[in-house]
Amino acid sequence: MRQTNDHLTIQPKILYYGTPVVLISTENEDGTSNLAPMSSAWALGQVVVLGLGAEGQTAHNLRERPDLVINLPTAEQWPAVERLAPLTGRDPVPDHKRGAFRYEPAKFAAAGLRPEPAELVRAQRVAECPLQLEARAVRITPDLHDDFLIVEAHVLRVHADPAVVVPGTQHVDPTAWCPLIYNFRHYFGLGPQLGQSFRSETPVVGVAGN
């Protein structure tokens, strides 16, 4: 570690610098459901880009069956996410996961979550998640070292709890919706609102100077 000006040059083992957590549900070969947490997810238009391990059950399922649901938990639901964290749907457990992960076929039950049918895809939704995005993987690309997959998923339908929707609109209320953030392997919610983008179509609530 060395210092340059006012910054230190460091080599962190991970770069999870604060991104939303999602729960990805996919369909197994036998028609049952797999559910996996991940924090490498971002949206561009109606496409959500996902990064996931190449040897996991989610990757295996999406290669064969492209349907999925991107379920977004709230900050308060982090214990359910953590219950899923040490589980894998792969049997046998992949070599790189042995010792830290265990095989669990009933992921919904293990997390204390309830499945509910989707409308346009075969994968199931997580009933407790306020936002549920039915989607289909349209492109799957390996990374440079074949350790991960980059999945481009086209969102087909969005389900939202009325509590996080601006009444009478198609907008998610940013003052009501509090995503779960994965910050260097710690779980966080959002702090108070600081401001808004010039492109926002929802009103500012309780921000000083506005």
Where are these predicted regions, by residue range?
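Basic, polyanion-binding surface patches
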Residues: M1-N210
